[in-house]
Amino acid sequence: MEGVELKEEWQDEDFPIPLPEDDSIEADTLDGTDPDRQPGSLEVNGNKVRKKLMAPDISLTLDPGEDSLWSDDLDEAGEVDLEGLDTPSENSDEFEWEDDLPKPKTTEVIRKGSITEYTATEEKGDGRRWRMFRIGEQDHRVDMKAIEPYKKVISHGGYYGDGLNAIVVFAVCFMPESGQPNYRYLMDNLFKYVIGTLELLVAENYMIIYLNGATTRRKMPSLGWLRRCYQQIDRRLRKNLKSLIIVHPSWFIRTLLAVTRPFISSKFSQKIRYVFNLAELAELVPMEYVGIPECIKQYEEEKFKKRQKRVDQELNGKQEPPKSEQ
């Protein structure tokens, strides 16, 4: 093969063995005296030819040029002692590379399909994030971290009467605002949390105190969400619901219930009762363990001041003496 001019057209039959992928190919010369080196394309017939190879002008080539996929930089990076590198926990969540490649974070190094090793703290924290609730015959996972600011929406208010007749308090002022980007995700997890908690709290008959005061329209749950809650409640819980007391009902709530009354069963409609202040509520249920949010108390105080001011103005207007005619 001496004197034969090499062209850029390479044939597969000229390579009886696979080209080396892990070892570097010398760019300047092919040294045939190295016993550890794989035979190249010019040593097929046993002839040792020392000829300089020119890298083809293409982006993906097997020659070790500057634009080659198998460059010296990558070969040197592949020979790094992995055991000598610092682990992410020892190196502030970053790997140190010896070349000019960007330094990825640990989340970028972990690829799909790899197994993430948790520390004891992370494992404990992840266990707290998710909680299983049994609704009907199925188990549902709830993202407890996502709904953490809204868990006060439902609480246990003690018992009433004889036996384990539970008082369940539902405070709408703790609902998320509808303008949040993850609103649907929050409401879905909050729905499971409310239904699952309700089944845990209720043993026999129960009542729901619906605190509607101090709630903006953006925090009001939709009618579909409330209807879904009622439909997902177990039949036993729907039957054992003895009363739904709506405290500080707004005009919107009363109008909504009036419009939907034809579509609600008469038995459920008879369970609804409006209460306009906390004093009236205290006459119906024991308030010892009923947690009233501070915003509800402030809301009632402001309403009382406005009402008192209006009454005073009316009384002062009646007490003014009539003007004498001139």
Curated annotation (Swiss-Prot):
The keyword Cytoplasm applies. CDD domains: SEC14. Residues 147-304 form the CRAL-TRIO domain. It comes from the Eukaryota. The modification Phosphoserine is found at residues 41, 89, 92, 114. Transmembrane segments: none annotated. Pfam families: BNIP2, CRAL_TRIO_2. Its main location: cytoplasm. InterPro entries: Bcl2-/adenovirus-E1B (IPR022181), CRAL-TRIO_dom (IPR001251), CRAL-TRIO_dom_sf (IPR036865). This is BCL2/adenovirus E1B 19 kDa protein-interacting protein 2. The gene is Bnip2.
